[in-house]
Amino acid sequence: MKRFALALALMITASPAFAALKPGTRATDFTTQAVLAGKADTFNLNKALKNGPVVLYFYPKDSTPGCTTEGQNFRDLYADFQAANTLIFGVSRDSLKAHENFRSKQAFPFELISDQEETLCQLFDVIKLKKLYGREYLGIERSTFLIDSYGVLQQEWR
């Protein structure tokens, strides 16, 4: 019964009001909450794209070992992304406060987007059935997406 409930929940969350993005398609514009320079801010995709390509990397949870390492890797390569005129944004379901703490502690030079309502997670189809210590749950699949300056999804890494 528990597996059936999880499967049903997965089908419901996997059926967003809009189709998940695929490489070669134009990304839907969105505005959402984010943390920049230690303060709550907003992020708008079309506005960001005026400055060049955008990398959105989705990660499960702030301040966990794997997510910290991933964020540190993006931080350490930040100058290379800047040289390529590409902006980096991390996305998780964590709160703005959790993002503020995580960003400050790790000295991330990029914004962290709070997707507590899973709007972006559904758009990019990153909510997946996962297992941890034998328990099944719905969580974010670690994924990265490159959107060119025209708003077209060029590449995805999962």
Regions found by a protein language model. Give the residues of each.
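Chalcogenol-based redox active-site neighborhoods
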Residues: 18-158
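Positively charged n-region of N-terminal signal peptides that target proteins for export
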Residues: 1-4
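Short, linear, compositionally biased motifs with a strong N-terminal bias
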Residues: 10-11
